[in-house]
Amino acid sequence: MDKLVVNGGNPLFGSVEIGGAKNAAVAILPAAIMASEGISVIDNIPDIQDIQRLERIITSLGCKVKRVQNTVEIDSTNLTSVNADTEDGSKMRASYYLIGALLGRFGKAKVELPGGCPIGVRPIDQHIKGFEALGATVKISHGTVEAQADKLIGTNIYFDVVSVGATINLMLASVFAEGTTVLENAAKEPHIVDVANFLNSMGANIKGAGTDVIRIAGVEKLKGCNYSVIPDQIEAATYMIATAACGGCVTIKNVIPKHLESISAKLIEMGADIKEGDDYVTIESHKNLKGVNIKTLPYPGFPTDAQQPMSTLLSISQGRSIVNESIWESRLKHVDELKKMGANIKVEGTVAIIDGVEKLTGANVKATDLRAGAAMVIAALAAEGVSEISCIEHIDRGYPHIEDKFKELGANIRREKI
């Protein structure tokens, strides 16, 4: 196991290249196995643990998978197995996309109940409701989900709550369904649009992605295609927030600025300077930022995945800030770690009341989940003194080469074996 050792206090300067969106890539790889002809060549795939696990799972199903740097080739023409009941699947949330993909292509699927970050109850009831509405029978037993259908028939599906995962999974399952499927109260995140665009590039007929009503007209088959995944808005947000916390000036390259509007708006409100280009964002910060209130919401609102990094920044900003985590009820576990470094934060349910302190002090802390890990890296970079961050396997699930990228910006950070 590894840990990160950070000697904080350095401002950040330079530029950083953002990789492909984790949340898009972990759905696009399962989508690729739905092609019965041709090879999919997918560019801008991040080199992170969740992707490596998915590559192993779909290889075990009979696909041929080849990675060259950030490009992954998938040949699913000889895929025969529908049993994705693997240990890798139990360690990541996105393994559930294999249910929709396999059910859509073969009419049956067997997948290990998904794992991922311990940030609260993450039920798949909306997924199951949708699969059953299409005509599938779904059973959950001994940690495994099994779905089966003689034929999937398009229908209208209304999500009781806005769910990114259910929206994507039902898009996958509906691609081959007879007739038209309408998803109402659908999530609108950029990676949902990206998955729909990928499926359409393979021959699907999906309209309305990015709105709250998505229509999928069933097609007979999909063919492999060439595609490039959108940039990762949360990775970009992490480097923006880190620059604001440490001070300095950093250009974040290979981004879609529109996807970062909710982040940029809050950082500007706090006092940071932000300039946007077609595919970059430059942030300049002299620290001494003022606190703000945030509430996490589905896109285009403030993203829950950026809440924990932003909480770190607010802990060293002037005045009081209120953070309302409205998406996941257990996504404030990082607060106890920030307190070890001197943060003044009180948690009431899913609300954090943050009174900014002048500085944080280095300490031994742990990454309790993926985005909490990013929050602790930012805290350590901004703190006075040395910090050690353990449990960084969570960080590796979503941030490629995080220590190398921060080193390039002038941070004193290194990875060590425990």
Swiss-Prot record:
EC number(s) from the headed UniProt entry: 2.5.1.7
InterPro entries with a match to the protein in the record: Enolpyruvate_Tfrase_dom, Enolpyruvate_Tfrase_sf, MurA_subfamily, RNA3'P_cycl/enolpyr_Trfase_a/b, UDP_GlcNAc_COvinyl_MurA
Binding site for phosphoenolpyruvate: K22, N23
Modified residues (2-(S-cysteinyl)pyruvic acid O-phosphothioketal): C117
Primary localization class, coarse: cytoplasm
Annotated metabolic or biological route of this protein: Cell wall biogenesis; peptidoglycan biosynthesis
Catalytic activity: phosphoenolpyruvate + UDP-N-acetyl-alpha-D-glucosamine = UDP-N-acetyl-3-O-(1-carboxyvinyl)-alpha-D-glucosamine + phosphate
Localization per Swiss-Prot or TrEMBL: Cytoplasm
GO CC term, one of those recorded: cytoplasm
UniProt similarity note: Belongs to the EPSP synthase family. MurA subfamily.
Protein name: UDP-N-acetylglucosamine 1-carboxyvinyltransferase 2
Species of origin: Clostridium acetobutylicum (strain ATCC 824 / DSM 792 / JCM 1419 / IAM 19013 / LMG 5710 / NBRC 13948 / NRRL B-527 / VKM B-1787 / 2291 / W)
